[in-house]
Amino acid sequence: MATSSFSIIKVECWPVDIPLTDPFVVATGTRLVAENVFVRVTLSSGAQGYGEAAPFPEVDGENRESCLGALRQLGKAILDRSAADYEGIGRLLSELAPTQPAARCGLETACIDAYCHGLHIPMWKLWGGADVRNRETDITIPICSLDKTLELAREWYGRGFRLFKMKIGIDVGEDVRRLQAVHQALPDIAFIGDGNQGFSRDECLAFVDGVKRFDGTLALLEQPVAREDLESLAAIRRDTGIPVAADESVRSLEDAKQIIAHGAADYVNIKIMKTGVVEAREIAAYTLSSGLKLMIGGMVETRIAMGCSFSLVLGMKGFEILDLDTPLLLAEDPVSGGFEYQGAWLSPWKLPGLDLFAQPPNNVTVIQRH
């Protein structure tokens, strides 16, 4: 057992409800409220760190109750371990809860944040600090009516956003009409079409043809078809000439290897909620070494989880497309400190860890030695 100042002596977790400004509708489900879990880890030195579990049941099968249940068990498993061994902790959590990546992610993030506080360094410095600069994110527009799509597009355009991630995948004709309306209103923007597995191969090809007919700029197709249909992903790349990003298809390092072996994508979308932080870094490094490109996104997250993802961008090289926008879709911000948004741009922070604080409620779950 670790006896250093980095020894984990307490884990706390509590549920948080954060309403969204507008319904978050994608091909696989709808969110009105982010039902997440915050985690806080305390070390023997007194250093504390925060993490967040942001399950999206339609995507990963996890929900808040399953996350809380997993965290109660996983928290016990890491008591007295050294947060300095965050890689070993990540591997242990993967072995103990292979089907609970969001819960693991929340606990991993809190351990790493606490460790960085103990070292008095920003989290991005732990990953090398190779690319510390302001970075631009896209903005997500959910599946909604034509009028609402235009309203949101004009609002975000006015706030400085120029890359619009359009949720698609339910109705090809309606998807094309929505993009065309935005293109006509705001001709200098570019699109990411995010299908969330909603299309068949033929539907995706029809969608791309429709966008090409009105000369829309389609920068990327993200996960247009089912996660296991690597053949169609490869065919869509070949037949459209549009870069393809694998999202739901990559939930592990082994998945990333399969994507690369099948020539199924140009980009891999890194999400710490799919894999935990340690494996996300491994996937990112492998992707780059294999000649593919990186984007990074998230579930419906606050600036805790999104800050951890941004730390990877700042610490490692190679993240070309940032989809780190969901805190902007929330009606309130339950955390203080940390990175800041300036329009479409994310600004790094300089203080230790994630430089974030969240106030626990009275009904927090506490895991510690008695």
Enumerate the language-model features and the residues they cover.
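Structured beta-strand/loop patches that form or line metal/cofactor-binding pockets in enzymes
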Residues: 2-48, 53-59, 332
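Flexible C-terminal active-site loop/helix
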Residues: 3-20, 36, 300-370
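Metal- or metallocofactor-binding catalytic centers and their adjacent structured scaffolds
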Residues: 10, 42-118
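Glycine-rich, aromatic-flanked loop segments that form ligand/cofactor-binding clefts
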Residues: 109-141, 148
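Active-site mouth loops of central-metabolism enzymes
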Residues: 133-148, 168-169, 200-201, 245
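Catalytic domains of carbohydrate-active enzymes, especially glycoside hydrolases
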Residues: 156-164
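Catalytic core of soluble alpha/beta enzymes
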Residues: 166-305, 331-341
